[in-house]
Amino acid sequence: MAQASNSRIKVGIVGGTGYTGVELLRLLSQHPHVELTAITSRKEDGLPVADMYPNLRGRVKLAFSAPEKASLTDCDVVFFATPHGVAMAQAAELLAAGTRVIDLAADFRLQDTAVFERWYKIPHTCPDILADSVYGLVELNREAISKARVIGNPGCYPTTVLLGLAPLIEGGKQLVDVQTLIADCKSGVSGAGRKAEVGSLFSEASDNFKAYGVAGHRHQPEIVAQLEKLAGGKVGLTFVPHLVPMIRGMFSTLYARILPQARDTDFQALFEARYADEPFVDVMPAGSLPETRSVRASNNLRISVQRPGGGDQLVILVVQDNLVKGASGQAVQNMNLMFGLPESAGLDQVAILP
């Protein structure tokens, strides 16, 4: 049963030392309906959170605790900001105690376990729970999320691609050629996480711009599965991610070929109508171009609809902060829905400029 909106939700975070973990802490420490009760890290057991993240001094007074010491089953909801495979190992125990689960990794994103195992190279150990889980893209699954016990929080790239293409294909619309969709996406280096890797070292990532995962990226099957669910049939997607030398931010340029019978469609009006009531999706005025800095540290996602030369190629530009709407902010948005809270609770931060 969803907790009443006038009581405080007891929240636990598993894996609080990475970038998505500290973003959860930043957002939840300002949330009017949340009580942070447990933050786990085996390596940092006993270390005050504020000692690792000084930006949280005076905001978060908890210390990290080893997972076995944390009373996670006493929480109303537990967020997993962990590597793939961790949430599925603990979900059954939490659910049995009445604790809800929001996983920021991929354990509950793909309903096909064979596809999951092929891309993530680990067995899926709780297919029964997976079948009961909900894909947590609020703007597409709001009603199901409000009733869910387990949420698979979407990946950062899928969030931009799905929200950028949904108005064109949902409900089987015959507006664009769904077999020739292209997603050309760029992410800041924080998307790679906080672990030490050569590719995200300053001397490697700075003053450099590169594509990666062109032959196949883990987010490809996630995007395709959700696009096909929206379209009601098979879709074809070319997805190419890139790494750009900035910390936060994601810019996705999406291409869709307009079908002959849809050439007279007002696509600007279509997008504006679709997202008119969405608190975190902003369709920019015709002719405007989005920038990643306009959404930095906020839960906002901005969309621009372009039709170069009035031709048959539609170009959709989408920006978000990969750590907020692309990860932790979206997870909090899901929590709000699950517990009957205002969707924007704790998420009304204005983007940082400059």
Swiss-Prot record:
Catalytic residues (UniProt): C156
Main location: cytoplasm
GO terms assigned for molecular function: N-acetyl-gamma-glutamyl-phosphate reductase activity; NAD binding; NADP+ binding
Keywords recorded for this protein, A-Z: Amino-acid biosynthesis, Arginine biosynthesis, Cytoplasm, NADP, Oxidoreductase
Location(s) in or outside the cell: Cytoplasm
GO biological process: L-arginine biosynthetic process
Catalytic activity, reaction form: N-acetyl-L-glutamate 5-semialdehyde + phosphate + NADP(+) = N-acetyl-L-glutamyl 5-phosphate + NADPH + H(+)
Gene Ontology CC, one term: cytoplasm
The UniProt record lists the keyword Magnesium: no
PROSITE patterns linked to this entry: ARGC
Pathway: Amino-acid biosynthesis; L-arginine biosynthesis; N(2)-acetyl-L-ornithine from L-glutamate: step 3/4
Cited CDD domains: AGPR_1_C, AGPR_1_N
E.C. numbers: 1.2.1.38
Family in the record: Belongs to the NAGSA dehydrogenase family. Type 1 subfamily.
Summary of the function given for this chain in its UniProt record: Catalyzes the NADPH-dependent reduction of N-acetyl-5-glutamyl phosphate to yield N-acetyl-L-glutamate 5-semialdehyde.
UniProt-recorded name of the protein: N-acetyl-gamma-glutamyl-phosphate reductase
Organism: Bordetella pertussis (strain Tohama I / ATCC BAA-589 / NCTC 13251)
